[in-house]
């Protein structure tokens, strides 16, 4: 049986604005699904039941009085426990932040969604301090993949991806520093976006790497994702892309990223990308020779800024941290400033190299992750013929593109049932800043042609 939550976000909001559907009905359905499924998935760190019901009642009162509640009227959502929610402690997934001073205001992005009538259902699990790709949390536990609960949801926004994939909420928000939206979106078989730098406000979001951090939404269709993205974006990002960027009268020029972006991909992941290119009749393959160095630069910047941010508390109470995160932060405190400076300088050089590619191509395509979701009990991946920890290595294809500062969609490949384990495979679709309209238009075309699309895991389709 299909849940009412599975309808497009715009349709749900329109029905609530017209009075055809009550916000209370929608929120109650979300709460029921959270109660039924969160125990097996561990998406939520807090469920704000009374607050959500009160907000739904207010939306219904506004509609009864003829007031338009907004573009997202009555639609439930949830946010990564990295975003300030007024009256709550922002834990950032950390035990040592439980009981910290409650936020005086909502994060700007949370407030933007509420201003358009969306209803916050709760906060979502994550890797501690957003430092990892697995959402295995020493205090809050592991978030599990709805397609196979023995497997990872990915991270660090794993709760955000799992909750949407299982249909607990129609959309959610997370953060992406080095791939923390794209990795879990890919592993959970839904849509996500890492926006261009400064496209979405970061006020009220706990930082990891200030010059790499971004906020990105998750959804189960390109239409839903674009709608939420438009609400979250700064006004300057809402403008229609100009004609020269869209190139409306010309074919979209597509290239696949080779080299680093195929070297460690499993056969099934690489086959998905190659099949997509073949279906598009796109043959161009380009390499970014400095991609591996770009990944190293992102690692250095993350370690150095993370270590500096946490130095005081690490000195006073190191045992209060998740051991896996503590070790990485401590290593970051020892990164020489000269090495950090080189990484920052390299970032500017790398961006110029990527910009040159977009002189010849409109869209670049690459895998999201090197493999499908690893097991929770064996969170490892094979990199250069070595078994390595997924916590640090699931983002080998997302980290270099993060450094470039470009907008990137994570889209779920539709697999052939006869040849697959049915675990999702995510594909990155990237463009240059200012071409976001083209990015969404291209993704919608793929979705309409049946090449990409999210599919609710069968056990949650009720």
Task: State each model region's role.
Residues 1-53, 64, 455-462:
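An N-terminal boundary/leader segment
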Residues 11-14, 57, 311-403, 458-461:
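Serine-dependent amide/ester hydrolase catalytic core
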Residues 11-18, 97-101, 213-220, 329-335, ...:
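Short, well-ordered beta-strand elements within core beta-sheets of diverse protein domains
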Residues 36, 115, 165-260, 274, ...:
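Structural helix-boundary/capping segments
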Residues 59-76, 246-255:
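Immediate post-signal peptide segment of exported/extracytoplasmic ligand-binding proteins
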Residues 72-95, 251-253, 300-355, 367, ...:
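Short helix-loop capping/hinge segments that flank enzyme active sites or metal/cofactor-binding pockets
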Residues 72-214, 366-386:
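Short glycine/serine-rich loop/turn segments
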């Amino acid at each position: 049986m299909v849940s009412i939550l599975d309808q497009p976000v715009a349709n749900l909001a329109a029905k609530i604005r017209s009075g055809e559907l009550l916000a209370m009905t929608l929120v109650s359905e979300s709460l029921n699904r959270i109660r039924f499924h969160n125990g097996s998935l561990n998406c939520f760190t807090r469920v704000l039941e009374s607050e959500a019901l009160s907000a739904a009642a207010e939306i219904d009162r506004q509609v009864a009085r003829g007031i338009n509640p907004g573009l997202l009227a009555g639609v439930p959502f949830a946010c990564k426990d990295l975003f300030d929610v007024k009256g709550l402690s922002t834990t950032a997934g950390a035990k040592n932040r439980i009981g910290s001073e409650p936020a005086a205001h909502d994060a700007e992005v949370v407030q933007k969604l509420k201003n358009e009538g969306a209803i916050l259902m709760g906060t979502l699990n994550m890797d501690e301090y957003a430092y990892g790709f697995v959402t295995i949390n020493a205090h809050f536990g592991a978030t599990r993949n709805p397609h196979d609960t023995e497997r990872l949801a990915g991270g660090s926004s794993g709760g955000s991806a799992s909750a949407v994939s299982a249909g607990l909420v129609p959309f959610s928000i997370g953060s992406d520093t080095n791939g923390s939206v794209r990795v879990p979106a890919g592993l959970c078989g839904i849509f996500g976006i890492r926006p261009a730098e400064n496209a979405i406000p970061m006020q009220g979001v706990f930082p990891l790497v200030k010059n790499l951090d971004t906020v990105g939404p998750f959804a189960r269709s390109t239409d839903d994702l674009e709608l939420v993205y438009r609400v979250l974006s700064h006004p300057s990002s809402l403008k229609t892309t100009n004609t020269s960027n869209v190139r409306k009268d010309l074919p979209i020029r597509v290239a696949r990223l080779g080299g680093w972006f195929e070297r460690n991909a499993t056969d099934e992941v690489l086959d998905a990308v190659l099949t997509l290119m073949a279906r598009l009749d796109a043959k161009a393959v380009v390499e970014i020779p400095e991609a591996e160095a770009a990944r190293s630069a992102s690692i250095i910047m993350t370690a150095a800024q993370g270590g500096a941010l946490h130095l005081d508390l690490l000195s006073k109470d190191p045992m209060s941290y998740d051991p896996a995160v503590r070790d990485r932060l401590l290593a970051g405190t020892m990164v020489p400033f000269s090495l950090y400076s080189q990484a920052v300088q390299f970032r500017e050089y790398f961006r110029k190299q990527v910009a040159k590619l977009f002189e010849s191509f409109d869209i670049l395509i690459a895998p999201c992750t090197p493999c499908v979701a690893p097991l929770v009990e064996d969170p490892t991946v094979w990199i250069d013929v070595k078994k390595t920890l997924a916590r640090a290595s699931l983002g080998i294809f997302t980290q270099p593109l993060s450094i470039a500062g470009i907008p990137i969609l994570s889209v779920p490949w539709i697999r052939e049932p006869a040849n697959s384990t049915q675990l999702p495979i995510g594909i990155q679709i990237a463009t240059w800043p200012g071409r976001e309209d083209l990015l969404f238009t291209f993704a919608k075309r793929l979705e309409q042609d049946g090449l990409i699309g999210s599919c609710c895991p069968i056990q949650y389709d009720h």
